[in-house]
């Protein structure tokens, strides 16, 4: 299905936590897995007392031996206490570096799988070639930044890399454009910078603002807390809205691609292409509305993450 990659440009704006919350809030009827592919190493195994294997390391080794096969993925999945399916990353940068060369094959395998994948790519690292390949394979890339001037400066450089411009660009702009949706900005936490101004400076459309909510974030990381307060928290509400928006954009992009394929198969010309675009827009609007109105029925985020 589709890969949605979350990444950051500086610091720790909560990419792992947000990835898990978005995965837990994914619209009903669509299977989703969260995959940790942070070059600095994974956190989920330590947070939830899981083993490092099965996970990304064992999947990478299996693909190295057997080649790409989407059916291999499910053998390396673990579940958080509440049931959210995850591919845990290896602990630490040194361990993560040992599978970096396999991440391109991992990305292709995830893209062929029947589920959607929310991938925690961590902080952007130019030397991490596997991370770059994952971002190339993603249909949506979400850059998560805190609202401050320093983050905006780093975000501008990251945007140039994501869009394939600038001296250090490693992700071709042609890929981002052909992905159907592209790159977006999410501003997370509290700070002095205005989110819309940051988006303008960075050059990415603002997808969402996620409020600072340390208490809810702690619960999402496995610490004890009130289930009722967590479910009603601003952080969970923002994650649900973000999941619905992303899912709607994916549905719209898929509809456009399918309509375009039908037009080409029927020998359609410019008119056929126009019909395809119309179908994509209609589907996107309908799906977005449906997802938004149905978020109340989404299984408890806390239930999926921490039981």
Language-model regions, residue ranges each:
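Walker A/P-loop phosphate-binding motif and the immediately C-terminal alpha-helix
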Residues: 2-40, 44-47, 110
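Hydrophobic beta-strand segments of well-ordered beta-sheets in folded domains
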Residues: 3-4, 32, 84, 117, ...
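P-loop/Walker-type NTP enzyme "switch/lid" segment
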Residues: 7, 37-112, 218-221
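Helical mechanochemical/support elements of P-loop NTPase systems and associated helical scaffolds
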Residues: 25, 40, 102-103, 150-154, ...
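Short, hinge-like loop/turn segments at secondary-structure boundaries
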Residues: 50-54, 161-162, 201, 224-228
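Conserved catalytic-core segment of NTP-binding enzymes
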Residues: 105, 112-212, 218
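C-terminal lobe/tail of nucleotide-utilizing enzymes
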Residues: 167-276, 286-307
